Structure formats: structure tokens, C-alpha cells
């Protein structure tokens, strides 16, 4: 039974998150329905990450096991044909070994958060950015973000419903930069806690608008207390932009 690695792009707005749910539209459910329409198989896909409602992806990675040995390009084209009415696209399909796993073989996940920082609201990007009217100091955010890099107890930035056994995570990259009218936050780590990225983003935004200092961010991290977190940024501006695997650049 050949295993296929699929790279997926999607707009998270129409879906109640990635994970399949019986009575709500989901990214996983749409992809699995497309596989069934193509092959007749009822399957479960595995994903590198399960994004929340409204969160987008430019390079989510999933794998699927098919009964027939189809050419990878045929799989990609067929799934896209069945996903044409969905806000989902298969960007690439590759045959991988049976022991390769989209989630457990991953050693890095990359997220981008987009803040639109101008007075005028978004007309074309509504639901795809967080609109913040007050001027943001991206340099101050970048300085404060460095306190989060490294191995830490991220209890402060962990959702109360998070099911991870440990709050310890190693954040490899936290980078903030201004790109025109937008402020971009990039985070890279092997894995993240539930809503960790949005919690860090909302907290750093408090620094950007002058309500918090870098020392406040450090104090919040060291408090190991969810109530010490700043506001949680909305899902709108968050994108899963890449998943890294050993041996890949």
C-alpha cells in the first residue's frame, strides 16, 4: 500500500479547524472526502499539525495510504479536481516510505503571523490578517521576542485546554520585521503548544503598541501562569508556512 506525502495550501476561514468533525466542515474532512471520491477508499490522513478554526496554511504536510500505486502527479491532479469547490489545494505529491510520517517524522514547524498596521481596514485581506490601527514598533517587538527563544516552560503562553504532557518547548526562531504596512512575526520550533503562537503574538503586540515592555514579556514567561499572558491574537493572521524533515534543507 503506497504512502503519499501531500503538501497542502488552504484558507482556514470556511473550516472549523483542520481536524475532522462529524457535524462541522474541516480541512481534514474535505481532503478525505476527495480521496474517497477519487479512489473509493475510506481513509484517515495524518497531518504535521492540526490548525485551529480560521488558521491558514501555505505548506501543511499530510500523508495518505492508497491501495493502488498511482503516479504522484495523478494523485495531486485528481485530488485537486475533487477539491475544486473547497478553499484547499494540493501543491505537491511525492511517494514516501511506509515508515515516513507527516507528524512524527517532522523536526521543524514554521509559522508566520501577519499584522496589518494602518488606519484603513483591509478590503482584500479581511480574515487573512490581524488589523491593528495603532502604530507598532516592530523593532521593540523583535527585541522583546528574543526572551522567548530557547528552551522554556511556556505555561504562560499555553491554552488552558492544551493536552500536551509538558509545557517545555524549545523555540528556535522568533523574528519580527516590518514589511510595508504589515508587521510579520515568524516562529520556528520542532513543535508548539496549543495556541502558543497566537499567545506569543498577542503579547508581543502589546510591546509594539507601547503597553508592555520587553521586561514585561520576560516576567510573563517566568511567571509560568496563563493569567500573565497578554491578549491572544486572532486566528485570522496565522499561517502554517512550512514543515521541516531530516535531510531536507
Curated annotation (Swiss-Prot):
The active site is at 52 (nucleophile). Gene3D superfamilies: Pseudouridine synthase I, catalytic domain, C-terminal subdomain, Pseudouridine synthase I, catalytic domain, N-terminal subdomain. GO terms for biological process: tRNA pseudouridine synthesis. Transmembrane segments: none annotated. Substrate binds at residue 111. It catalyses: uridine(38/39/40) in tRNA = pseudouridine(38/39/40) in tRNA. Its EC number is 5.4.99.12. Keywords: Isomerase, tRNA processing. One of its GO terms (molecular function) is tRNA pseudouridine(38-40) synthase activity. Belongs to the tRNA pseudouridine synthase TruA family. Homodimer. Formation of pseudouridine at positions 38, 39 and 40 in the anticodon stem and loop of transfer RNAs. This is tRNA pseudouridine synthase A. The lineage of its organism: Bacteria, Pseudomonadati, Pseudomonadota, Alphaproteobacteria, Caulobacterales.
Amino acid at each position: 500500500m503506497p504512502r503519499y506525502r501531500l503538501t497542502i495550501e488552504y484558507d482556514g476561514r470556511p473550516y472549523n479547524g483542520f481536524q475532522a468533525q462529524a457535524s462541522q466542515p474541516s480541512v481534514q474532512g474535505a481532503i478525505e472526502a476527495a480521496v474517497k471520491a477519487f479512489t473509493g477508499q475510506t481513509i484517515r490522513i495524518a497531518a504535521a499539525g492540526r490548525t485551529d478554526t480560521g488558521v491558514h496554511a501555505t505548506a501543511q504536510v499530510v500523508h495518505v495510504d492508497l491501495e493502488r500505486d498511482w503516479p504522484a502527479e495523478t494523485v495531486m491532479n485528481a485530488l485537486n479536481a475533487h477539491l475544486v469547490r473547497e478553499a484547499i489545494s494540493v501543491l505537491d505529491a511525492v511517494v514516501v516510505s511506509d515508515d515516513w510520517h507527516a507528524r512524527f517524522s517532522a523536526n521543524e514547524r514554521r509559522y508566520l503571523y501577519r499584522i496589518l498596521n494602518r488606519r484603513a481596514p483591509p478590503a482584500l485581506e479581511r480574515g487573512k490578517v490581524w488589523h491593528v490601527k495603532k502604530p507598532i514598533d516592530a523593532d521593540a517587538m523583535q527585541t522583546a521576542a528574543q526572551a522567548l527563544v530557547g528552551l522554556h516552560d511556556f505555561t504562560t503562553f499555553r491554552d488552558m485546554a492544551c493536552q500536551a504532557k509538558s509545557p517545555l518547548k524549545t523555540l528556535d526562531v522568533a523574528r519580527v520585521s516590518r514589511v510595508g504596512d504589515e508587521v510579520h512575526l515568524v516562529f520556528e520550533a520542532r513543535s508548539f503548544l496549543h495556541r502558543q503562537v497566537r499567545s506569543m503574538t498577542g503579547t508581543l503586540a502589546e510591546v509594539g503598541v507601547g503597553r508592555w515592555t520587553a521586561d514585561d514579556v520576560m516576567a510573563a514567561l517566568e511567571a509560568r501562569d496563563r493569567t500573565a499572558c497578554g491578549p491572544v491574537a486572532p486566528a485570522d493572521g496565522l499561517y502554517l508556512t512550512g514543515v521541516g524533515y531530516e535531510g531536507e534543507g
